[in-house]
Amino acid sequence: MQTLGHHYHALVIGSHGAIGRALLEAITADPNCALATGLSRATHAGFELTDEASMAQAAESLKADAPFDLIIDATGALTIDGHGPEKTLGALDAAKLQRSFEINAIGPALLIKHFAPLLAKERSLYAKLSARVGSISDNHKGGWYGYRASKAALNMFLQTAAIEIQRKRPQAVVVALQPGTVASSLSGPFAGGHDVITPEVSTEGLLQTLDATEAKPGAQFLDYRGQTITW
């Protein structure tokens, strides 16, 4: 990372997953990074996306490492409680939809609430892993109801949060990132027909994309190759 200067501080939330782990390893290896911190259930006992109190406690415990120049939220799930994405209207279930929104939209929104205040006042980056299927205008195949809808809701949270964050931090960049179809436990059962990449390839592209992203009003929606995705 070149645009954050020397001695930048970074935080990866969800650092125990395939992409989160690869991101943390790559950032730690960056000679310009002075501090790379991971946050997950493995590093902070009791931390849960469905428990706001645990998020607040984690944020409080990391204040000593702030301000952070880079925060990446790598949380999220496609298969939840053993249930994959719905393919038809007939498969919709209220409880399963609620769980998808809790993990993929509500939890990440609350993370922004508690961790955005830890961003540096100068150029800083808040990035959240999203998904191309969260694009409303790019939905031409249907299916995956809960996952699509939760990611679309996440994108709206990011756009709305970006407006508020940039009032106090005009140089802040808020980005929804599409990491590609990464070889992981999340994507494995659904990777058919897609070009599967390793977490390391995805991470390299994501960090290059973030490094090249300039501050613009509102959030941006980009893939790991730096290409803009329509909302």
What are these regions (language model features)?
Residues I13-A29:
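N-terminal Rossmann NAD(P)H-binding glycine-rich loop of SDR-like oxidoreductase domains
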Residues L111-F115, L119, F157-L158:
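Hydrophobic positions on the long internal alpha-helix
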Residues A172, A176, S184, P189-W231:
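C-terminal helical subdomain
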Residues S61-T75, I80:
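A glycine-rich helix->loop->beta "capping" turn
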Residues L39-Q57, L62:
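Rossmann-fold cofactor-recognition segment
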Residues A77-D81, P85-F101, R123-Q159, I163-K168:
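Catalytic loop of short-chain dehydrogenase/reductase
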Residues E25, A109, A152-I163, E200-L207:
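Conserved active-site helix of classical SDR/Rossmann-fold NAD(P)-dependent CH-OH oxidoreductases
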